[in-house]
Protein backbone atom coordinates (compact mmCIF):
# COMPACT_ATOMS: atom_id res chain seq x y z
CA UNK A 1 0.00 0.00 0.00
CA UNK A 2 1.42 3.38 -1.04
CA UNK A 3 1.23 5.50 2.09
CA UNK A 4 4.40 7.61 1.93
CA UNK A 5 4.64 10.67 -0.30
CA UNK A 6 8.21 11.48 -1.32
CA UNK A 7 9.53 13.58 -4.20
CA UNK A 8 6.05 13.96 -5.67
CA UNK A 9 5.18 10.24 -5.75
CA UNK A 10 3.34 7.83 -3.49
CA UNK A 11 5.25 4.76 -2.41
CA UNK A 12 4.93 1.95 0.09
CA UNK A 13 6.73 2.03 3.38
CA UNK A 14 9.29 -0.69 3.93
CA UNK A 15 9.22 -0.76 7.72
CA UNK A 16 6.91 -2.22 10.33
CA UNK A 17 3.21 -2.66 9.50
CA UNK A 18 0.87 -0.61 11.68
CA UNK A 19 -2.80 0.34 11.75
CA UNK A 20 -5.07 3.20 12.69
CA UNK A 21 -8.23 2.29 14.60
CA UNK A 22 -11.49 4.03 15.34
CA UNK A 23 -11.20 4.56 19.12
CA UNK A 24 -14.80 3.50 19.80
CA UNK A 25 -15.57 0.69 17.35
CA UNK A 26 -11.93 -0.48 17.06
CA UNK A 27 -12.52 -0.76 13.31
CA UNK A 28 -9.34 -0.56 11.23
CA UNK A 29 -9.36 2.71 9.28
CA UNK A 30 -5.89 2.71 7.75
CA UNK A 31 -3.04 0.24 7.30
CA UNK A 32 0.46 0.82 6.08
CA UNK A 33 4.13 0.26 6.69
CA UNK A 34 6.40 2.72 8.42
CA UNK A 35 9.18 4.55 6.64
CA UNK A 36 12.63 3.05 7.11
CA UNK A 37 15.72 5.17 7.86
CA UNK A 38 16.65 4.88 4.18
CA UNK A 39 13.24 6.25 3.16
CA UNK A 40 13.60 9.02 5.72
CA UNK A 41 16.90 9.97 4.13
CA UNK A 42 15.32 9.87 0.66
CA UNK A 43 12.57 12.24 1.82
CA UNK A 44 15.11 14.68 3.29
CA UNK A 45 17.12 14.58 0.06
CA UNK A 46 13.96 15.23 -1.97
CA UNK A 47 13.15 18.23 0.21
CA UNK A 48 16.72 19.51 -0.18
CA UNK A 49 16.57 19.25 -3.96
CA UNK A 50 13.22 21.08 -4.05
CA UNK A 51 14.33 23.85 -1.68
CA UNK A 52 16.12 26.25 -4.07
CA UNK A 53 13.27 26.38 -6.56
CA UNK A 54 10.60 26.85 -3.89
CA UNK A 55 12.57 29.46 -1.94
CA UNK A 56 13.26 31.46 -5.10
CA UNK A 57 9.59 31.75 -5.96
CA UNK A 58 8.12 35.12 -5.14
CA UNK A 59 6.08 35.46 -1.97
CA UNK A 60 2.96 36.02 -4.06
CA UNK A 61 3.59 32.78 -5.96
CA UNK A 62 3.89 30.83 -2.74
CA UNK A 63 0.77 32.51 -1.37
CA UNK A 64 -1.13 31.43 -4.50
CA UNK A 65 -0.32 27.77 -3.77
CA UNK A 66 -1.36 28.18 -0.14
CA UNK A 67 -4.65 29.75 -1.19
CA UNK A 68 -5.24 26.86 -3.59
CA UNK A 69 -4.68 24.53 -0.63
CA UNK A 70 -7.32 26.43 1.34
CA UNK A 71 -9.72 26.00 -1.58
CA UNK A 72 -9.01 22.26 -1.64
CA UNK A 73 -9.70 22.03 2.10
CA UNK A 74 -13.02 23.80 1.60
CA UNK A 75 -13.94 21.44 -1.21
CA UNK A 76 -13.18 18.42 0.97
CA UNK A 77 -14.46 19.92 4.23
CA UNK A 78 -17.08 17.26 4.95
CA UNK A 79 -14.75 14.42 3.99
CA UNK A 80 -11.95 15.80 6.13
CA UNK A 81 -14.20 16.44 9.13
CA UNK A 82 -15.47 12.86 8.93
CA UNK A 83 -11.91 11.57 8.67
CA UNK A 84 -10.80 13.58 11.72
CA UNK A 85 -13.83 12.43 13.69
CA UNK A 86 -13.53 8.74 12.95
CA UNK A 87 -9.78 8.62 13.59
CA UNK A 88 -9.61 10.77 16.75
CA UNK A 89 -13.06 10.05 18.17
CA UNK A 90 -14.01 13.72 18.48
CA UNK A 91 -17.61 14.62 17.56
CA UNK A 92 -18.35 15.82 14.04
CA UNK A 93 -19.27 19.32 15.23
CA UNK A 94 -15.79 19.68 16.68
CA UNK A 95 -14.05 18.08 13.70
CA UNK A 96 -15.78 20.59 11.43
CA UNK A 97 -14.39 23.47 13.50
CA UNK A 98 -10.91 21.98 13.09
CA UNK A 99 -11.25 22.05 9.31
CA UNK A 100 -12.36 25.68 9.52
CA UNK A 101 -9.25 26.46 11.56
CA UNK A 102 -7.11 24.79 8.90
CA UNK A 103 -8.64 26.99 6.20
CA UNK A 104 -8.30 30.16 8.25
CA UNK A 105 -4.64 29.43 8.97
CA UNK A 106 -3.69 30.51 5.44
CA UNK A 107 -4.81 34.14 5.71
CA UNK A 108 -3.57 34.37 9.30
CA UNK A 109 -0.13 33.07 8.31
CA UNK A 110 0.15 35.51 5.42
CA UNK A 111 -0.75 38.41 7.71
CA UNK A 112 1.72 37.21 10.34
CA UNK A 113 4.51 36.75 7.80
CA UNK A 114 4.08 40.25 6.40
CA UNK A 115 3.92 41.78 9.87
CA UNK A 116 6.68 39.85 11.62
CA UNK A 117 9.05 38.67 8.90
CA UNK A 118 8.44 40.93 5.94
CA UNK A 119 10.89 43.40 4.43
CA UNK A 120 11.66 46.75 6.06
CA UNK A 121 14.08 49.48 5.06
CA UNK A 122 15.13 52.99 5.99
CA UNK A 123 17.92 55.51 5.37
CA UNK A 124 21.09 55.25 7.43
CA UNK A 125 23.63 57.91 6.52
CA UNK A 126 24.58 57.49 2.87
CA UNK A 127 23.22 53.93 2.79
CA UNK A 128 19.95 52.08 3.22
CA UNK A 129 19.40 49.71 6.14
CA UNK A 130 17.34 46.74 5.00
CA UNK A 131 15.82 43.91 7.01
CA UNK A 132 14.81 40.78 5.13
CA UNK A 133 14.18 37.18 6.14
CA UNK A 134 15.36 33.90 4.68
CA UNK A 135 13.99 30.37 5.08
CA UNK A 136 16.04 27.85 7.02
CA UNK A 137 15.91 25.16 4.35
CA UNK A 138 14.55 21.68 5.08
CA UNK A 139 12.45 21.43 8.24
CA UNK A 140 10.85 18.41 9.86
CA UNK A 141 7.33 18.75 11.28
CA UNK A 142 6.08 16.31 13.92
CA UNK A 143 2.30 16.39 14.35
CA UNK A 144 0.15 15.36 17.33
CA UNK A 145 -3.00 13.24 17.35
CA UNK A 146 -5.41 15.54 19.18
CA UNK A 147 -5.68 18.05 16.30
CA UNK A 148 -4.15 16.00 13.48
CA UNK A 149 -5.13 18.52 10.82
CA UNK A 150 -4.92 21.91 12.49
CA UNK A 151 -1.77 21.63 14.61
CA UNK A 152 0.61 20.22 11.96
CA UNK A 153 -0.93 22.77 9.61
CA UNK A 154 0.14 25.46 12.08
CA UNK A 155 3.77 24.54 11.38
CA UNK A 156 3.58 23.47 7.74
CA UNK A 157 1.74 26.51 6.36
CA UNK A 158 4.07 29.20 7.77
CA UNK A 159 7.10 27.05 6.97
CA UNK A 160 6.13 26.74 3.31
CA UNK A 161 5.11 30.38 3.16
CA UNK A 162 8.59 31.42 4.30
CA UNK A 163 10.17 29.30 1.56
CA UNK A 164 11.16 26.18 3.49
CA UNK A 165 10.55 22.66 2.29
CA UNK A 166 9.03 20.16 4.72
CA UNK A 167 9.27 16.53 5.78
CA UNK A 168 6.10 15.76 7.74
CA UNK A 169 5.78 12.90 10.21
CA UNK A 170 2.29 12.76 11.71
CA UNK A 171 1.29 10.84 14.81
CA UNK A 172 1.13 7.11 14.16
CA UNK A 173 -2.37 7.26 15.67
CA UNK A 174 -3.74 9.57 12.95
CA UNK A 175 -2.09 8.63 9.64
CA UNK A 176 -5.31 8.79 7.64
CA UNK A 177 -5.93 12.48 8.38
CA UNK A 178 -2.34 13.26 7.39
CA UNK A 179 -2.69 11.38 4.12
CA UNK A 180 -5.86 13.23 3.20
CA UNK A 181 -4.29 16.58 4.09
CA UNK A 182 -1.32 15.87 1.84
CA UNK A 183 -3.72 15.02 -0.99
CA UNK A 184 -5.17 18.51 -0.58
CA UNK A 185 -1.67 19.96 -0.97
CA UNK A 186 -1.18 17.91 -4.12
CA UNK A 187 -4.47 19.25 -5.51
CA UNK A 188 -3.18 22.75 -4.77
CA UNK A 189 -0.27 22.24 -7.15
CA UNK A 190 2.54 22.09 -4.61
CA UNK A 191 5.73 21.14 -6.51
CA UNK A 192 7.28 17.73 -6.02
CA UNK A 193 9.56 17.46 -3.00
CA UNK A 194 8.32 20.62 -1.29
CA UNK A 195 6.20 18.57 1.14
CA UNK A 196 7.04 14.95 1.89
CA UNK A 197 5.00 12.60 4.09
CA UNK A 198 6.60 9.92 6.26
CA UNK A 199 4.34 7.57 8.19
CA UNK A 200 5.58 5.69 11.22
CA UNK A 201 6.09 5.67 14.94
CA UNK A 202 8.94 6.27 17.33
CA UNK A 203 11.72 4.75 15.21
CA UNK A 204 10.73 6.81 12.17
CA UNK A 205 10.67 9.94 14.31
CA UNK A 206 14.10 9.25 15.78
CA UNK A 207 15.55 8.70 12.31
CA UNK A 208 14.07 11.95 11.01
CA UNK A 209 15.17 14.03 14.00
CA UNK A 210 18.69 12.60 13.75
CA UNK A 211 19.03 13.13 10.01
CA UNK A 212 21.89 15.58 9.36
CA UNK A 213 20.11 16.94 6.30
CA UNK A 214 17.37 18.80 8.19
CA UNK A 215 17.85 22.42 9.21
CA UNK A 216 15.18 22.42 11.89
CA UNK A 217 12.35 20.57 13.57
CA UNK A 218 8.94 21.87 14.64
CA UNK A 219 7.10 19.76 17.21
CA UNK A 220 3.74 19.76 18.97
CA UNK A 221 3.11 16.99 21.45
CA UNK A 222 3.94 15.58 24.86
CA UNK A 223 6.57 16.93 27.20
CA UNK A 224 8.23 13.52 27.31
CA UNK A 225 8.80 13.43 23.55
CA UNK A 226 9.74 17.11 23.48
CA UNK A 227 12.35 16.55 26.18
CA UNK A 228 13.80 13.66 24.19
CA UNK A 229 14.02 15.84 21.07
CA UNK A 230 15.68 18.63 23.04
CA UNK A 231 18.31 16.19 24.28
CA UNK A 232 18.75 14.80 20.78
CA UNK A 233 19.42 18.33 19.49
CA UNK A 234 21.91 19.15 22.26
CA UNK A 235 25.11 20.55 20.81
CA UNK A 236 23.44 21.39 17.49
CA UNK A 237 22.97 25.17 17.61
CA UNK A 238 22.84 25.25 13.82
CA UNK A 239 19.40 23.60 13.93
CA UNK A 240 16.21 25.52 14.77
CA UNK A 241 14.06 23.60 17.25
CA UNK A 242 10.53 24.75 18.08
CA UNK A 243 8.76 22.79 20.82
CA UNK A 244 5.12 23.24 21.85
CA UNK A 245 4.29 20.86 24.67
CA UNK A 246 1.61 20.35 27.26
CA UNK A 247 0.82 21.67 30.70
CA UNK A 248 -0.52 20.89 34.15
CA UNK A 249 -2.77 23.90 33.78
CA UNK A 250 -4.44 25.59 36.78
CA UNK A 251 -7.83 27.28 36.80
CA UNK A 252 -8.56 29.35 39.91
CA UNK A 253 -12.17 30.07 40.83
CA UNK A 254 -12.82 33.11 43.00
CA UNK A 255 -16.15 33.63 44.77
CA UNK A 256 -18.08 34.88 41.72
CA UNK A 257 -21.72 35.94 41.56
CA UNK A 258 -22.70 33.77 38.60
CA UNK A 259 -22.12 30.15 39.59
CA UNK A 260 -23.77 28.84 36.41
CA UNK A 261 -21.30 30.78 34.25
CA UNK A 262 -18.45 29.48 36.37
CA UNK A 263 -19.61 25.89 35.97
CA UNK A 264 -19.98 26.30 32.21
CA UNK A 265 -16.48 27.74 31.84
CA UNK A 266 -14.98 25.02 34.02
CA UNK A 267 -16.59 22.31 31.89
CA UNK A 268 -15.41 23.97 28.67
CA UNK A 269 -11.93 24.26 30.16
CA UNK A 270 -11.63 20.71 31.49
CA UNK A 271 -13.72 18.42 29.31
CA UNK A 272 -13.87 19.80 25.77
CA UNK A 273 -12.18 17.41 23.32
CA UNK A 274 -12.44 14.80 26.10
CA UNK A 275 -9.76 16.75 27.93
CA UNK A 276 -7.29 16.29 25.06
CA UNK A 277 -6.30 19.88 24.45
CA UNK A 278 -2.92 20.95 25.74
CA UNK A 279 -4.54 24.01 27.35
CA UNK A 280 -7.25 22.04 29.18
CA UNK A 281 -7.57 22.73 32.89
CA UNK A 282 -5.99 19.89 34.86
CA UNK A 283 -6.19 21.50 38.31
CA UNK A 284 -9.23 23.38 39.59
CA UNK A 285 -8.50 25.61 42.58
CA UNK A 286 -11.64 26.25 44.65
CA UNK A 287 -11.96 28.32 47.85
CA UNK A 288 -12.64 26.50 51.09
CA UNK A 289 -16.02 27.04 52.72
CA UNK A 290 -19.71 26.92 51.86
CA UNK A 291 -19.48 28.81 48.57
CA UNK A 292 -16.82 26.44 47.24
CA UNK A 293 -18.88 23.46 48.38
CA UNK A 294 -21.89 24.80 46.48
CA UNK A 295 -19.84 25.38 43.34
CA UNK A 296 -18.46 21.85 43.37
CA UNK A 297 -21.88 20.34 44.00
CA UNK A 298 -23.26 22.16 40.97
CA UNK A 299 -20.21 21.30 38.84
CA UNK A 300 -20.55 17.61 39.67
CA UNK A 301 -24.29 17.62 38.97
CA UNK A 302 -23.89 19.23 35.54
CA UNK A 303 -20.80 17.22 34.58
CA UNK A 304 -22.66 13.99 35.34
CA UNK A 305 -25.15 14.85 32.57
CA UNK A 306 -22.56 15.52 29.85
CA UNK A 307 -23.27 13.51 26.71
CA UNK A 308 -20.44 11.19 25.71
CA UNK A 309 -20.56 9.14 22.53
CA UNK A 310 -19.21 8.12 19.15
CA UNK A 311 -18.04 10.79 16.73
CA UNK A 312 -21.07 10.43 14.45
CA UNK A 313 -23.69 9.87 17.13
CA UNK A 314 -26.92 11.85 16.75
CA UNK A 315 -27.86 13.98 18.56
CA UNK A 316 -24.23 14.97 18.79
CA UNK A 317 -22.46 14.41 22.10
CA UNK A 318 -20.36 17.08 23.80
CA UNK A 319 -17.48 14.65 24.33
CA UNK A 320 -16.17 11.92 22.11
CA UNK A 321 -13.59 9.33 23.04
CA UNK A 322 -9.97 9.65 23.98
CA UNK A 323 -7.55 8.63 21.28
CA UNK A 324 -7.14 4.94 22.11
CA UNK A 325 -7.95 2.13 24.52
CA UNK A 326 -4.39 2.37 25.80
CA UNK A 327 -4.89 6.04 26.63
CA UNK A 328 -8.22 5.29 28.33
CA UNK A 329 -6.67 2.58 30.49
CA UNK A 330 -3.75 4.84 31.44
CA UNK A 331 -6.16 7.55 32.60
CA UNK A 332 -8.18 5.08 34.65
CA UNK A 333 -4.94 3.86 36.22
CA UNK A 334 -3.97 7.44 37.06
CA UNK A 335 -7.33 7.96 38.75
CA UNK A 336 -6.87 4.78 40.80
CA UNK A 337 -3.38 5.84 41.85
CA UNK A 338 -4.57 9.25 43.03
CA UNK A 339 -7.41 7.68 45.01
CA UNK A 340 -4.99 5.22 46.58
CA UNK A 341 -2.88 8.15 47.76
CA UNK A 342 -5.67 10.03 49.50
CA UNK A 343 -7.76 11.66 46.78
CA UNK A 344 -11.55 11.67 47.15
CA UNK A 345 -13.96 10.96 44.31
CA UNK A 346 -16.47 13.70 43.55
CA UNK A 347 -17.46 12.24 40.18
CA UNK A 348 -15.90 8.98 39.07
CA UNK A 349 -14.41 8.83 35.60
CA UNK A 350 -15.77 5.63 34.07
CA UNK A 351 -15.42 3.57 30.92
CA UNK A 352 -19.09 3.02 30.04
CA UNK A 353 -18.44 0.55 27.24
CA UNK A 354 -15.84 -2.21 27.49
CA UNK A 355 -13.59 -2.28 24.45
CA UNK A 356 -14.24 1.38 23.57
CA UNK A 357 -12.09 4.40 24.43
CA UNK A 358 -15.04 6.38 25.78
CA UNK A 359 -14.61 7.92 29.23
CA UNK A 360 -17.08 9.94 31.26
CA UNK A 361 -15.90 13.14 32.98
CA UNK A 362 -14.10 12.61 36.27
CA UNK A 363 -13.65 15.06 39.15
CA UNK A 364 -11.52 14.18 42.18
CA UNK A 365 -10.45 16.19 45.21
CA UNK A 366 -6.68 15.81 45.58
CA UNK A 367 -6.24 18.34 48.39
CA UNK A 368 -5.22 15.59 50.82
CA UNK A 369 -2.68 13.99 48.47
CA UNK A 370 0.68 14.76 50.06
CA UNK A 371 2.78 14.61 46.90
CA UNK A 372 0.62 15.30 43.90
CA UNK A 373 2.32 14.15 40.68
CA UNK A 374 3.15 17.11 38.44
CA UNK A 375 1.97 15.39 35.28
CA UNK A 376 -0.28 16.22 32.37
CA UNK A 377 -3.15 13.74 32.59
CA UNK A 378 -4.33 14.07 28.99
CA UNK A 379 -8.02 13.31 29.32
CA UNK A 380 -11.29 14.15 31.11
CA UNK A 381 -9.99 13.96 34.70
CA UNK A 382 -10.12 17.19 36.70
CA UNK A 383 -8.24 17.46 39.99
CA UNK A 384 -9.73 19.79 42.62
CA UNK A 385 -7.56 21.58 45.17
CA UNK A 386 -9.18 23.65 47.92
CA UNK A 387 -7.43 26.87 49.00
CA UNK A 388 -7.70 29.12 52.07
CA UNK A 389 -6.61 32.44 50.57
CA UNK A 390 -5.96 34.02 47.18
CA UNK A 391 -2.19 34.25 47.70
CA UNK A 392 -2.18 30.54 48.48
CA UNK A 393 -4.17 29.86 45.32
CA UNK A 394 -1.62 31.67 43.16
CA UNK A 395 1.23 29.81 44.83
CA UNK A 396 -0.54 26.51 44.20
CA UNK A 397 -1.23 27.45 40.58
CA UNK A 398 2.49 28.06 40.04
CA UNK A 399 3.51 24.81 41.77
CA UNK A 400 4.29 23.07 38.50
CA UNK A 401 7.26 22.63 36.21
CA UNK A 402 4.96 23.45 33.29
CA UNK A 403 3.87 26.89 32.17
CA UNK A 404 1.42 26.69 29.28
CA UNK A 405 -1.94 28.06 30.44
CA UNK A 406 -3.49 29.48 33.60
CA UNK A 407 -6.91 30.98 34.20
CA UNK A 408 -8.95 32.91 36.74
CA UNK A 409 -12.71 33.16 37.15
CA UNK A 410 -13.28 36.24 39.30
CA UNK A 411 -15.44 39.36 39.52
CA UNK A 412 -12.43 41.35 40.74
CA UNK A 413 -10.18 43.07 38.21
CA UNK A 414 -7.67 43.79 40.97
CA UNK A 415 -7.36 40.08 41.68
CA UNK A 416 -6.90 39.38 37.99
CA UNK A 417 -4.11 41.94 37.81
CA UNK A 418 -2.45 40.23 40.79
CA UNK A 419 -2.94 36.83 39.19
CA UNK A 420 -1.60 37.98 35.82
CA UNK A 421 1.47 39.54 37.41
CA UNK A 422 2.43 36.42 39.32
CA UNK A 423 1.34 33.70 36.86
CA UNK A 424 4.10 31.82 35.11
CA UNK A 425 2.40 30.80 31.88
CA UNK A 426 2.31 31.74 28.22
CA UNK A 427 -1.51 31.94 28.15
CA UNK A 428 -3.35 33.69 31.00
CA UNK A 429 -7.14 34.05 30.73
CA UNK A 430 -9.69 35.92 32.83
CA UNK A 431 -13.35 34.85 32.92
CA UNK A 432 -12.92 32.85 29.72
CA UNK A 433 -12.41 29.15 29.24
CA UNK A 434 -8.80 28.09 29.53
CA UNK A 435 -8.96 26.41 26.13
CA UNK A 436 -9.84 29.68 24.40
CA UNK A 437 -7.13 31.37 22.33
CA UNK A 438 -7.02 34.19 19.78
CA UNK A 439 -5.80 33.38 16.27
CA UNK A 440 -4.02 36.74 16.21
CA UNK A 441 -1.93 35.85 19.28
CA UNK A 442 1.06 33.59 19.92
CA UNK A 443 0.54 30.16 21.43
CA UNK A 444 3.15 28.65 23.69
CA UNK A 445 4.44 28.34 27.21
CA UNK A 446 7.47 28.41 29.45
CA UNK A 447 9.14 25.83 31.65
CA UNK A 448 8.44 22.27 30.56
CA UNK A 449 5.75 23.53 28.16
CA UNK A 450 8.11 24.76 25.46
CA UNK A 451 11.44 26.29 24.52
CA UNK A 452 10.38 29.90 23.96
CA UNK A 453 9.34 29.31 20.35
CA UNK A 454 5.68 30.29 20.52
CA UNK A 455 3.56 29.04 17.63
CA UNK A 456 0.27 30.26 16.10
CA UNK A 457 0.69 33.93 15.12
CA UNK A 458 4.37 33.87 16.12
CA UNK A 459 5.19 30.77 14.05
CA UNK A 460 6.64 33.11 11.43
CA UNK A 461 9.45 33.88 13.87
CA UNK A 462 10.88 30.35 13.82
CA UNK A 463 10.18 29.68 10.14
CA UNK A 464 12.68 32.25 8.86
CA UNK A 465 15.81 33.97 10.11
CA UNK A 466 16.52 37.72 9.85
CA UNK A 467 19.17 39.13 7.54
CA UNK A 468 20.27 42.72 8.18
CA UNK A 469 21.94 44.60 5.33
CA UNK A 470 23.54 47.98 4.69
CA UNK A 471 23.19 48.77 0.99
CA UNK A 472 24.37 51.49 -1.37
CA UNK A 473 23.86 51.61 -5.11
CA UNK A 474 27.42 52.72 -5.81
CA UNK A 475 30.80 52.46 -4.15
CA UNK A 476 32.10 55.89 -3.06
CA UNK A 477 34.52 57.31 -0.54
CA UNK A 478 33.04 58.91 2.55
CA UNK A 479 33.30 62.67 2.83
CA UNK A 480 35.62 62.29 5.82
CA UNK A 481 38.19 59.53 6.12
CA UNK A 482 38.77 57.66 9.36
CA UNK A 483 41.77 59.07 11.29
CA UNK A 484 45.02 57.27 10.50
CA UNK A 485 44.11 56.37 6.91
CA UNK A 486 45.74 58.27 4.03
CA UNK A 487 44.74 57.84 0.41
CA UNK A 488 46.91 59.58 -2.21
Swiss-Prot record:
Keywords: Arginine metabolism, NAD, Oxidoreductase. Pathway: Amino-acid degradation; L-arginine degradation via AST pathway; L-glutamate and succinate from L-arginine: step 4/5. One of its GO terms (molecular function) is succinylglutamate-semialdehyde dehydrogenase activity. It holds the Pfam family Aldedh. Its EC number is 1.2.1.71. The active site is at residues 244, 278. It comes from the Bacteria. NAD(+) binds at residues 221-226. It catalyses: N-succinyl-L-glutamate 5-semialdehyde + NAD(+) + H2O = N-succinyl-L-glutamate + NADH + 2 H(+). One of its GO terms (biological process) is arginine catabolic process to glutamate. Catalyzes the NAD-dependent reduction of succinylglutamate semialdehyde into succinylglutamate. Belongs to the aldehyde dehydrogenase family. AstD subfamily. NCBIfam families: arg_catab_astD, PRK09457.1. This is N-succinylglutamate 5-semialdehyde dehydrogenase. It comes from Pseudomonas savastanoi pv. phaseolicola (strain 1448A / Race 6) (Pseudomonas syringae pv. phaseolicola (strain 1448A / Race 6)).
Amino acid sequence: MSTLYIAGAWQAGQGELFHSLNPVSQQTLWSGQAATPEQVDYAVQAARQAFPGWAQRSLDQRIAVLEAFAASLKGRADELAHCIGEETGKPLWESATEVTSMVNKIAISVQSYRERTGEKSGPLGDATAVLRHKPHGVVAVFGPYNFPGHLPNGHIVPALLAGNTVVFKPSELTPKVAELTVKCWIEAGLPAGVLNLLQGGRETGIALAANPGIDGLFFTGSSRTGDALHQQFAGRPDKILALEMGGNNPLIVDQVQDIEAAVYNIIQSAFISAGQRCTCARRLLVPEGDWGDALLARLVAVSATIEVGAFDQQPSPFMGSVISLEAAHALLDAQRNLLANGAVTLLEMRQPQAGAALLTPGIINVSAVAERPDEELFGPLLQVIRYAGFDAAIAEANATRYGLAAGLLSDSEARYQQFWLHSRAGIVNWNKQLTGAASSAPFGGVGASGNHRASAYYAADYCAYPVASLEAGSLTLPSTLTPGIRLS
